[in-house]
C-alpha cells in the first residue's frame, strides 16, 4: 500500500483578479491546496502543497509510527529509488538519515537522535561501512570515550531472514545485539540494546555503500521461552498467543495489544509486541514484530523524532 500522490487529486486553485483599469497580465495559476486520500483508511483531507509537519494540527494521543517489516522496506525502496508515489512526503520526519561513512555502528545508540532507554523505537537510514579496506566484513565496533572496559560492538545474532511480500523476497533483515568488554579476559557482556537492520534485494548481505534502514531500541522486557509466556500473563492484561504453523514447529508471538474494554485489541494494523518467542522456527519466515513497546504521541502534538 503506497501513499496517494498522483496528480489526479482534486485541487483548489487560487485565481488573481486584476483591479479595474489595470492591464491584465498572464499569471500562472498555482495550486494552493488539494484534497488527498489516506491510502490506509480512505479519509479525505485538505493538503497544502507548501505545508510541512509543523503546519499539521497535531496527532491524536496514541498515534505511533510502527511499520511492519514489509512497510519498512517499502519506505526504504521509496528512498533509494526516489519514487514519489512510494516515498511519503513526511518520511524524513520519522526516519532520520545518518550521514557519514561510519553510519550507526560507529556511534553508541545512546548518542543517536531521540534514542533512550524507555523502549521507544527509532528508525534511521544509513550506509554500513567496511571494517577493513579489504574483505567484506562490516564495521560494528562502536566508538566510545574510553576503551578501558574493552571494546563495545554490535554482534549479529541468529540467521539473516528474508522479508517476504506477495510471495517473493523483497529484502532481508538481520538482528544485532550490543556487547561490551570485547577483547578482555572475561566473557563479553550482553546489553539490552538491539538493532534490526533491513536491506533490499535478493542477497543476504547488503552491498558496499548501499542505503539500509535500521530500527534501534533498548529492550525493557526480558525474553521468555515457550510455556512461561502464558504463565507470565496476568488475568487483567493477558496477551494474545497466536500459534503459526511452520514445518513441524510452532511460532509464538507475545503481543502487548491489551483489551480495550470492548473485546478488541488496542493495537494498530501491524503486529507489534514486547517480545518474540521462537520454538522450532521454520527456515524462512516473514518478520512483523518490533520486539518492544511502540511509539506513543501525547498531548496531540506532532511526532518529530
From Swiss-Prot:
- The question of whether Transcription regulation is a record keyword is answered with yes
Principal subcellular localisation of the protein:
nucleus
Name the InterPro entries on file: NAC-dom, NAC_dom_sf, SOG1-like
A cellular component annotation (GO) from this entry: nucleus
What is a single molecular function from GO for this protein?
A: DNA-binding transcription factor activity
Going by the entry's taxonomy, the superkingdom of the source organism is recorded as: Eukaryota
Keyword Isomerase tagged: no
Gene3D superfamilies associated with the record: NAC domain (2.170.150.80)
The UniProt keywords, alphabetically, are:
Activator, DNA-binding, Nucleus, Transcription, Transcription regulation
**UniProt xrefs under PROSITE patterns:** NAC
An example Pfam family from this entry, by short name, is: NAM
User: Where's it found, cell-wise?
Assistant: Nucleus
**Which residue ranges carry the DNA-binding annotation?**
170-225
Q: Which SUPFAM superfamilies match?
A: NAC domain
Q: In which tissues is it expressed?
A: Expressed in protoxylem and elongating interfascicular fiber cells of elongating internodes, developing metaxylem cells and interfascicular fibers of non-elongating internodes and developing secondary xylem of roots.
Domain named NAC: residues: 59-219
UniProt-listed GO biological process terms = positive regulation of DNA-templated transcription; regulation of secondary cell wall biogenesis
Q: What is known of its domains?
A: The NAC domain includes a DNA binding domain and a dimerization domain.
Q: What job does this protein perform?
A: Transcriptional activator that plays a regulatory role in the development of secondary cell wall fibers. Involved in the regulation of cellulose and hemicellulose biosynthetic genes as well as of genes involved in lignin polymerization and signaling. Is not a direct target of SND1.
Annotated protein name in UniProt: NAC domain-containing protein 73
Q: Which organism is it from?
A: Arabidopsis thaliana (Mouse-ear cress)
- Lineage, top ranks: Eukaryota, Viridiplantae, Streptophyta, Embryophyta, Tracheophyta
Amino acid at each position: 500500500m503506497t501513499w496517494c500522490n498522483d496528480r489526479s487529486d482534486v485541487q483548489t486553485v487560487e485565481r488573481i483578479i486584476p483591479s479595474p483599469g489595470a492591464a491584465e497580465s498572464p499569471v500562472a495559476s498555482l495550486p494552493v491546496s488539494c484534497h488527498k486520500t489516506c491510502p490506509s483508511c480512505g479519509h479525505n483531507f485538505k493538503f497544502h502543497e507548501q505545508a510541512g509537519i509543523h503546519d499539521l494540527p497535531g496527532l491524536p494521543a496514541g498515534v505511533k509510527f510502527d511499520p511492519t517489516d514489509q512497510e519498512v522496506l517499502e519506505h526504504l525502496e521509496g528512498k533509494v529509488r526516489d519514487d514519489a508515489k512510494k516515498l511519503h512526503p513526511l518520511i524524513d520526519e520519522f526516519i532520520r538519515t545518518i550521514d557519514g561513512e561510519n553510519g550507526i555502528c560507529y556511534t553508541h545508540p545512546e548518542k543517536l537522535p531521540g534514542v533512550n532507554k524507555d523502549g521507544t523505537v527509532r528508525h534511521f537510514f544509513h550506509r554500513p561501512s567496511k571494517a577493513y579496506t579489504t574483505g567484506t566484513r562490516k564495521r560494528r565496533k562502536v566508538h566510545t570515550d574510553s576503551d578501558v572496559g574493552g571494546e563495545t560492538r554490535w554482534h549479529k545474532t541468529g540467521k539473516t531472514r528474508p522479508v517476504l511480500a506477495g510471495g517473493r523476497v523483497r529484502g532481508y533483515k538481520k538482528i544485532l545485539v550490543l556487547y561490551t568488554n570485547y577483547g578482555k579476559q572475561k566473557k563479553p557482556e550482553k546489553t539490552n540494546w538491539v538493532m534490526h537492520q533491513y536491506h533490499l534485494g535478493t542477497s543476504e548481505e547488503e552491498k558496499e555503500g548501499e542505503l539500509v534502514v535500521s530500527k534501534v531500541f533498548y529492550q525493557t522486557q526480558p525474553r521468555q521461552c515457550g510455556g512461561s509466556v502464558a504463565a507470565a500473563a496476568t488475568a487483567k492484561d493477558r496477551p494474545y498467543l497466536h500459534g503459526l504453523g511452520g514445518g513441524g514447529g510452532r511460532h509464538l508471538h507475545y503481543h502487548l495489544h491489551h483489551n480495550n474494554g470492548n473485546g478488541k485489541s488496542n493495537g494498530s494494523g501491524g503486529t507489534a509486541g514486547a517480545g518474540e518467542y521462537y520454538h522450532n522456527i521454520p527456515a524462512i519466515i516473514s518478520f512483523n514484530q518490533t520486539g518492544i513497546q511502540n511509539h506513543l504521541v501525547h498531548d496531540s502534538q506532532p511526532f518529530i523524532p
